[in-house]
Amino acid sequence: MAPAAGACAGAPDSHPATVVFVCLFLIIFCPDPASAIQVTVSDPYHVVILFQPVTLPCTYQMSNTLTVPIVIWKYKSFCRDRIADAFSPASVDNQLNAQLAAGNPGYNPYVECQDSVRTVRVVATKQGNAVTLGDYYQGRRITITGNADLTFEQTAWGDSGVYYCSVVSAQDLDGNNEAYAELIVLGRTSEAPELLPGFRAGPLEDWLFVVVVCLASLLLFLLLGICWCQCCPHTCCCYVRCPCCPDKCCCPEALYAAGKAATSGVPSIYAPSIYTHLSPAKTPPPPPAMIPMGPPYGYPGDFDRHSSVGGHSSQVPLLRDVDGSVSSEVRSGYRIQANQQDDSMRVLYYMEKELANFDPSRPGPPNGRVERAMSEVTSLHEDDWRSRPSRAPALTPIRDEEWNRHSPQSPRTWEQEPLQEQPRGGWGSGRPRARSVDALDDINRPGSTESGRSSPPSSGRRGRAYAPPRSRSRDDLYDPDDPRDLPHSRDPHYYDDIRSRDPRADPRSRQRSRDPRDAGFRSRDPQYDGRLLEEALKKKGSGERRRVYREEEEEEEGQYPPAPPPYSETDSQASRERRLKKNLALSRESLVV
C-alpha cells in the first residue's frame, strides 16, 4: 500500500481519474508482505490402553511457504479428573459442570482453566528436521512426524492430559496458531479371569471359588502334617504312612502298642510278660520235666570245684525255686500310692505293680526281644558289666583214663607204677591231670612233687630248658616239642577206634603217630627218670617263668584237635541266668529286681 500511495502522490499534475484508477489497480493486485496462519487438530479426543502406541495429529496452513515455522507440543494436565467424574456422575461438581456447559456450548471444564493450577510441560520441539524432547520426556520413544504430528510408541501412566500443538512463524501476524487434543491412558483388563499366564478360566461363581480355595488349603495342610509326622515322629502322634518318605520313616507301631497295652491291660505282642496281666489263655506252659543225669564223663559232682581256677570253688548262693504265691507275698515292698484315675500316673503305677510281683524263677516265653528288655529293666542295681574284667567260662571236665585205678589224693602211686601197666600214648597221656592253677605253677618249681613226674624233658630244638606256659585248660599240658608227647593223627577213624575199645578214654589224651625211634628208646628205658628234668629246671632263672609263650601257643594250636567252641557274646541275659540256677539259691551273677 505504501508504494501505491507514493505513486499516487507522485503524480499530482495528472488527470484525477487516471490517478484513481492506478491506485485501485495497485491496491488490488500488489501482494501483501504479512500473512495469517491456521492450526487444526483432526481428532481432539483419544483413549488408549497402557503401553500401546498412539499418534496425536496436528496440521497448520501458511500463505508464506518460504519461512519454516517452529512446532511446539506442550502437555497440560486436566483441570478436573475425568476418571473420577466418570465413576461418580451424580456428584455436585458434575451437576455444576453440566449447568455451565448448557449455558455456554463451547465451554470445557476439563481444559479451560488457568495454567497456574495445573501442570505444564514441554513435550517436544521441531524446527526443520530436528526434534528435541523436553527434560521430563528424555529417553522416551516420542517424536514429531509429518508436519506436526506427535507420536507415542509406548504410552505410560501419567500421559493422560491435554496436549497443545503450537506453530510459531516470524511472519505470523494474525490467525489461530494453537490447538489441543485430549489423551486418556487406561489399564488393560481381560475379558475372562486369568489364573495363570496364558490360562483363562470362564466365569466362576463366588461361592464355588470359596469352596475350591478351602479344599485346596485343607489338602495342603493335611499333606504337610502327614509328612511332618512321618519325618519327625517324636513331635506328633499320627500313625499314617506318608508317600513322600516311605523308606526313611515309618510309624512307631511298637511304641503305640506298648503304651496302649500299658494303659488298657490288653496283652501286647511286644511286651506280653512285663506290662500286661497274664490271662489264663496266655499263661505260659509249665517247664518240661528235667531228667536226672549223671556227672559228665563219669566224674564226681565236686570235680568242677576242684578243677576251677585257683583250686577254690565259688561259694555263692544260687537261685531258689520258690512258689509264685510266696514270692508275691514277700515282694510286696514299697509301692507308689498313685491315683489310678489320673491318666498320667497309670503307666507308672502299673509298671511298679508288675515289677513288685515279678518272679524271676517263673520261665517266660522264648522271645529274644522280651528277654533283652527284661535284662535292661532288672539290671539297674548291678554294677556295670563293662567295668568288670571278662572271665572265660570253665571248660567241661574231661575224664582221666586212669581215674578208676588211681585216687586224686595219691599221686605217688602213678610214679611207682610200672610203665607197662600205664595206658599207651607216652608220657603226655599217662600222667594225672592238674587239679588247679597252683599245681600248674608247681611244675616249674624245682624240687616239687609234680616237677619230677609231670614235666617233659627239655627239647633239643631249643637251647634252654623248656618251661611250659601257664595253662588255661587241662588239655594244654603237653609239650609240643617232645615227639613222645604229640597226639596221634587227626584221622577221624582213629577216634572211632579208640571209643570202640574204651568208651571212657579221652581222644585228646591219646598220642598221635609214633616215631620208630621212640619204640626202641622205650624198650631200652622202661621207666621215666625225673632227675634229669629236675637238674634242668634248677638252672632256669626266675625271669624265664614270666616270658610270654605266644609263639609256642600258636604252634600248639595247629597240633592238637580243635578246642571246644568259645563262649558267644551274643548269648542273652536270660541264658546266663538259667545257667546260674543251681543248689536252690540266688547267685550273685543273677539279676536283682
Swiss-Prot record:
Highest taxon in the source lineage: Eukaryota
Extracellular side: 36-206
The entry's keywords: Cell junction, Cell membrane, Chylomicron, Disulfide bond, Immunoglobulin domain, Isopeptide bond, LDL, Membrane, Phosphoprotein, Receptor, Signal, Tight junction, Transmembrane, Transmembrane helix, Ubl conjugation, VLDL
Glycyl lysine isopeptide (Lys-Gly) (interchain with G-Cter in ubiquitin) crosslink site(s): 582
Disulfide bond sites: 113-165
Organism: Rattus norvegicus (Rat)
Residue stretches spanning the membrane: 207-227
Post-translational modification: Phosphorylation at Ser-308 by MAPK8/JNK1 and MAPK9/JNK2 may be required for exclusive localization at tricellular tight junstions.
UniProt protein name: Lipolysis-stimulated lipoprotein receptor
